[in-house]
């Protein structure tokens, strides 16, 4: 689109087959950081643009979201989101217990002190979204090569020269963007560059189908007091929980394919046992709820919770896009645009 020259995308696996395939993909619009809201809005704009360009639907599920507060601390957080949403023009309203129960048939509404409903929030299938990005990029002239693992970034005299693939093939380029997610630092270490993030396990559980109790496309929820989120899933309920001590991983132990990596799945019931009591006041039978599936994967968390996007000072032509802090699907469109503008020397949006 920006006439930036020849662009090549290299993916070590099939597109959308790794971390993005293990995400809940909540496109939450309201954030306490204004810049992050801009990035998320750009993703929504990208989805609309891609659908128009390809003349096909990416099946965005405009289900809305409900943020729930049941303590003084979570109420302050809710109020901050409410203020941010109003400032950014995002539709929102506080709803009472009766309306909460109507929208969320599974919830114990008496546990809800305050509920903030944002009807334009959505979720999306990451495979469809990533496939949409790829198809649109190809249509606009980008060359895509999947199953091409990058072995090293080539530099000479503090300037990027390209990359070398695992096959030994050298690909020359004056600009290299390291967007390798959890694997990004493996490519940076030989260059004596460290990106300030750590791969941390994120996970969720999916219940058995009960379409009456968990109707399709009911609003997803964010429940800070339970360190939890929920999302509909074809008649089941996705339950995401954050344990008190999150498990991080040495990136050098990561396998080339995440399906071959052990995210300590043996601990999934231990984690559920630890976190379930916090959610029980909202989902009373969580102890007995049939669980059909468990999903885990890495999220790249940064100490200051800010994304790592832009040029690497040590090497001319080297850029990075990583450290998405669990928000890569939601903010991906904005992250891509910001990276492109920085590479081209344009004023960031």
Region locations from a protein language model:
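Glycine-rich phosphate/pyrophosphate-binding beta-alpha loops
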Residues: 26, 32, 121-126, 225-227, ...
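Helical element adjacent to the flavin cofactor pocket in flavoenzyme catalytic cores
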Residues: 116-175
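Central helical "cap/lid" subdomain
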Residues: 168-219, 346
């Amino acid at each position: 689109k920006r006439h930036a020259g020849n662009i090549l995308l290299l993916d070590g696996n099939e597109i959308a087959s790794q971390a993005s395939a293990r995400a809940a993909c909540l496109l939450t619009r309201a954030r306490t950081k204004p810049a992050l809201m801009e990035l998320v809005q750009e993703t929504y704009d990208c989805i609309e643009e891609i659908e128009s360009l390809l003349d096909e639907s990416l099946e965005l599920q405009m289900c809305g979201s409900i943020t729930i507060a049941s303590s003084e601390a979570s109420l302050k957080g809710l109020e901050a989101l409410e203020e941010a949403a109003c400032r950014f023009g995002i539709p929102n309203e506080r709803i009472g217990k009766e309306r909460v129960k109507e929208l969320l048939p599974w919830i114990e509404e008496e546990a809800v002190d305050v509920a903030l409903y944002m009807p334009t929030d959505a979720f999306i299938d990451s495979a469809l979204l990533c496939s949409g990005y790829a198809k649109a990029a190809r249509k606009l002239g980008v060359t895509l090569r999947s199953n091409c693992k990058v072995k090293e970034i080539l530099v000479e005299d503090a300037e990027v020269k390209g990359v070398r693939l695992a096959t030994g093939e050298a690909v020359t380029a004056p600009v290299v963007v390291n967007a390798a997610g959890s694997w990004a630092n493996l490519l940076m270490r030989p260059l004596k560059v460290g990106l300030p993030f750590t791969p941390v396990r994120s996970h969720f559980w999916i219940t058995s189908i009960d379409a009456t109790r968990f109707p399709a496309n009911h609003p997803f929820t964010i429940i800070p007091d339970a360190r939890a989120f929920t999302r509909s899933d074809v008649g089941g309920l996705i339950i995401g929980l954050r344990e008190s001590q999150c498990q991080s991983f040495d990136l050098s132990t990561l396998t080339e394919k995440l399906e071959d990596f052990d995210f300590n799945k043996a601990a999934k019931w231990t984690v559920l046992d630890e976190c379930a009591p916090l959610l029980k006041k909202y989902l009373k039978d969580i102890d007995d709820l049939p669980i059909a599936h468990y999903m885990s994967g890495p999220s790249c968390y940064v100490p200051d919770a800010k994304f790592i996007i832009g040029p690497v000072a040590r090497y001319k032509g080297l850029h990075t896009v990583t450290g998405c802090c669990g928000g890569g699907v939601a903010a991906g469109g904005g992250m891509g645009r910001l990276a492109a503008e920085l590479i081209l020397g344009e004023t960031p949006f």
